[in-house]
């Protein structure tokens, strides 16, 4: 949601990064994010990206990990993750990432890592702290994911 100042703070703190993944609601800021990141960027459209030509979802592989990203609203994530998990399993994803709820979550279910980094703009979890996640993949291909605060 156009949280450019928070994004700038996060990128300055975490740089250099190898990839940035944005899970939707850029509200026209995709070009700015891509220019600011200085690395490959994956962005999907959120429910507030009305006239965007961004993809609804993407799949890609990082160090042997099949990653599926979506904003999540088409999978009704506000009511639970079961539809999203079913889709991720159908796509043989190792990791599924979604946004929409603005609440951070990280867990594994049926062999799929499910994560929501929360929000650096409008957090909705208890305490309403702005959050994001950093994923590092070790030499064996195992991802380590950490929740961080702006």
Which ranges hold each PLM region?
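Well-ordered beta-strand positions
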Residues: 59-61, 107, 136
């Amino acid at each position: 949601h156009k949280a450019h100042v928070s994004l700038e703070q996060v990128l300055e703190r975490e740089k250099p990064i190898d990839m940035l993944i944005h899970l939707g609601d850029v509200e026209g800021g995709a070009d700015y994010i891509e220019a600011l990141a200085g690395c490959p960027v994956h962005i999907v459209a959120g429910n507030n990206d009305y006239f965007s030509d961004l993809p609804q979802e993407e799949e890609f592989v990082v160090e042997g990990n099949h990653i599926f990203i979506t904003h999540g609203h088409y999978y009704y994530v506000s009511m639970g993750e079961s539809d999203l998990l079913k889709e991720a399993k159908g796509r043989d994803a190792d990791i599924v990432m979604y946004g929409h709820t603005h609440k951070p979550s990280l867990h594994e279910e049926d062999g799929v890592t499910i994560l929501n980094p929360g929000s650096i703009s409008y957090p909705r979890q208890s305490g309403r702290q702005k959050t994001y996640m950093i994923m590092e993949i070790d030499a064996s291909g195992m991802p380590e994911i950490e929740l961080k605060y702006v």
